[in-house]
Amino acid sequence: MAAARPEAQSRSSPTPESRSQEPLDLVLVPDDCRPGTPPSDLIEIQVVKVTDTTLVPEPPEPGSFHCALCPAAFRLVSELLFHEHGHLAGAEGGGQGGDPSRCHVCGHSCPGPASLRAHYSLHTGERPYRCALCPRAFKALAPLLRHQHRHGVEPGTSRRPPDTAAVAEQRPGVAPERAEVVMAAAAAGAAVGKPFACRFCAKPFRRSSDMRDHERVHTGERPYHCGICGKGFTQSSVLSGHARIHTGERPFRCTLCDRTFNNSSNFRKHQRTHFHGPGPGLGDSGGQLGSSAAEGSGSGCGVGDPAEEGRGETAKVKVEADQ
């Protein structure tokens, strides 16, 4: 046993060339190199517990971690794990135990894909959200924003604050007392591909156009107006959907009952009436038709019964009038 230990250490120790590319405390070990484990193309991650006070090194350059099953590359190991979960879900029919939101490392079931993505960072110990004012790093954006708020209320920090006057000059409308928070949030969001921060709530975005659309929620600006009724909207896509109320255009058609809709939201809600369970058209039964659609009674779509059809049209008109 003692003779095998140096071999295991040499196998798991990164080479000098790879040490500069891999983050600290993360060891990538191919399954086929570990005795007693089933063959697999997926990598195994050594789990390391990292506390909030640990100084975490800078994240690796984009594309450092490559998927063994496809050409995809990722900046963080947790993103690679979430990507490989998709391969497992497709090969095993919905992930471990048939649950697409179940972690394939520990079997923990998460409420949804977003929670599952955040859960994988617990296995890797990565903290991509980094404070621009101190060496602290966090696993999620919410605790980082709470931490950064303390820099503005607690005196005696050893870190030099950012040039808030320059931020206010670049972003008109940013109050001087908010400029530090906005700049820190933008720096933290840049580490995860969201370098644009809202000047009102510091929410990060991937594109500046998305940030401007979001800021209209705070300012109340509605630059897109309907040419028929004059109603204003924050986004051009919402205006396009509103215009269908006036034109009568209904581009979304159900393939099961031929009902049409003027927006995708009502169309997806209608599709769920044909299937068991939640989801946009597919439920827990794997796409089995519900009793109303399978028996052809038309109770889910107002087909077959004149009274039901009339009630369906009344409800449809009411939905359109509310828009």
Swiss-Prot record:
Domain of life from the UniProt record: Eukaryota
Entry keyword Nucleus: yes
Bias-annotated ranges (Gly residues): 278-289
Subcellular location: Nucleus
UniProt keyword list: DNA-binding, Isopeptide bond, Metal-binding, Nucleus, Phosphoprotein, Repeat, Transcription, Transcription regulation, Ubl conjugation, Zinc, Zinc-finger
SUPFAM superfamilies named among the record's database cross-references: beta-beta-alpha zinc fingers (SSF57667)
Gene3D superfamilies registered for this protein in UniProt: Classic Zinc Finger (3.30.160.60)
Phosphoserine: residues bearing it: S13
UniProt keyword annotation of Cell cycle present: no
Cross-link (Glycyl lysine isopeptide (Lys-Gly) (interchain with G-Cter in SUMO2)): K318
One Gene Ontology MF term: zinc ion binding
GO BP annotations listed: hematopoietic progenitor cell differentiation; regulation of transcription by RNA polymerase II
Biased composition (Basic and acidic residues): 308-323
Stretch list, region Disordered: 1-26, 269-323
Job of this protein: May be involved in transcriptional regulation.
Family: Belongs to the krueppel C2H2-type zinc-finger protein family.
Name under which the protein is recorded: Zinc finger protein 784
Gene (UniProt): ZNF784
